[in-house]
Amino acid sequence: MSSFNLVQIVPTLDSGGVERGTVDVANFLAEKKIKNFIITSGGKMIKELDDNFTQVHQLPVASKNFFSYPLIARKINQFIKANNINIVHVRSRGPAWIINLMTKNNIKTIATFHNVYGGNSYLKKMYNKGLSKMDHLVAISEYVKKTIVKKYNLLPNKISVINRGIDTEYFNQSLDAETKDNIIKNHKIDTAKKIILFPARITSWKGQLEFIDVITKMDTQNIIVLFAEIQKMRAIQI
């Protein structure tokens, strides 16, 4: 492939690990002065992108309506041809099915499995399997790779493991004292104790219950755990 021309497809760019990874990849390419594209239905994280190098094209790719997928696929195909895109990276199951409706001539497709995706019904399993039909797959851990190899009968060499990370420079190191004091006061945090932060959406598969099960087996007299999601934080003294 003589040139690298990437589009990432993600349902929304509001918040979350999938969205953060999409923005981080786009900004890395922008730092290298490599033009790239994102197709999304929108979101507040768009403002974090460098519009000199990253072009955002808004389409309703967050839709769960399968009847709308052929029309969306046609529009994506037109966008790909108009911009000479040759690599398509889908980051969610819905967009994967949309791409599967396209004729994928002259493009390579990649999908990231950000988790193993639950669901025991036939329809749910089929929906989840859409990601596996791309040319190459990324798994965020060895566990995810082993699980999807077994679940979808995939060849291991079709999957690359790329562990998730964070850009520590993104976080505000100079948080003012008043903001810190307000957080401590609002959540009744005893600062004399060790504070553990678990940042993730509160849901059954993010691991909070397993974490609590482990932490309660320790000496917890001097520990406070903070479970934090976007615009919401819960302090639990264990």
Annotated model-derived regions:
Residues 33-36, 185-186, 190-194, 208-238:
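A conserved nucleotide-sugar
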Residues 143, 165:
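Carbohydrate-associated surface elements
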Residues 89-96, 113:
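Short His-centered aromatic/hydrophobic patch
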Residues 80, 107-140, 146:
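A conserved, positively charged/aromatic
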Residues 3-4, 8-70, 231:
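N-terminal strand-loop element at the rim of the active site
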Residues 172-189:
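A short helix/loop element that forms part of the nucleotide-sugar donor recognition site in Leloir-type
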Residues 11-14, 187, 199-203, 230-232:
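Short donor-sugar binding/catalytic loops of nucleotide-sugar-dependent glycosyltransferases
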Residues 16-24, 194-217:
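A conserved mid-protein helix/loop that constitutes part of the nucleotide-sugar donor-binding site
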